[in-house]
Amino acid sequence: MKTSSLTIIFIAVIITIICLNIHDIEAREIEFNAGRVVRSEKDCIKHLQRCRENKDCCSKKCSRRGTNPEKRCR
């Protein structure tokens, strides 16, 4: 009885550790992607940067281009 209880507790601890490690890896990926977004807003190429609502464009001029409804800086 004691051996099976210890085995169950051991398995539960291992599963908990694995789940916490997976969550930590996902959190690092989110932080990495957020850092990349911040860098891309700072280092923008004027003719490729898309205009977004309530945000300034790199070139400060925003107009529609082509048939796509998305707006781009000029």
Swiss-Prot record:
Gene Ontology molecular function: any one: toxin activity
InterPro entries, sorted: Scorpion_calcine
Keywords carried by this UniProt record: Calcium channel impairing toxin, Disulfide bond, Ion channel impairing toxin, Knottin, Neurotoxin, Ryanodine-sensitive calcium-release channel impairing toxin, Secreted, Signal, Toxin
Tissue: Expressed by the venom gland.
GO CC terms, sorted: extracellular region
Entry keyword Cell membrane: no
Disulfide bridge partners, by residue number: 44-58, 51-62, 57-73
Domain of life: Eukaryota
Family: Belongs to the scorpion calcin family.
Protein known as: Hadrucalcin
Organism whose genome encodes this protein: Hoffmannihadrurus gertschi (Scorpion)
